[in-house]
Amino acid sequence: QRWALPLPQVDPGDVVVEAFGCDPPPSFVDAMARPSSKPPVWINLEYLSAEDYVERNHGLPSPQPSSFGALTKWFFYPGFTAGSGGLLREADALNPGTPPWAELDLLPHPGERCVSLFAYADAPFGELFDLLADRPTLLLITAGASQSPALKALEGRPQRHLRAHALPWLTQRDYDRLLHACDLNFARGEDSVVRAMWAGAPF
């Protein structure tokens, strides 16, 4: 459920996951430390990184004060080595199914490079499009905050060999299928970058 302040009375679960250092409200921390209950396992999920500090910090305890005594928060760092928290991958992540061309009513032309674009709204779209236009390219622009500025950057620009298509909102499954169908994927955000890596065509 979505939380709002003041926080309603909520009993902590056996495991509490705090994402990216966003501390739970003090009243919830106190509930976690109540003497009448066993303290939950408190995990601080950190950002994905390939930096050396990930292995140094993964699994470290961090004592936290509360009205009823100290709790322990444990750092969890996703990463790319055995000394990190690793990455999640479901059994069929490397083979999510057939390309979603039929659902999108779209088909790449023979010899056309397929490129997906999921970016921030202030990305340098114009420069990218100029580079992509040097050879036959089907550019698939995902729905979201970047779609409108990306389409605007195409206006009045010689598109040469670039064919752009604005995509509707996709399910995670269909987005995975799209990533696997493309030759190059521009992705933003940890989860999407990892999904592009599983597809074998990240950027």
Regions found by a protein language model. Name each.
Residues Q1-S67, G144:
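Active-site and donor-binding regions of nucleotide-sugar-utilizing enzymes
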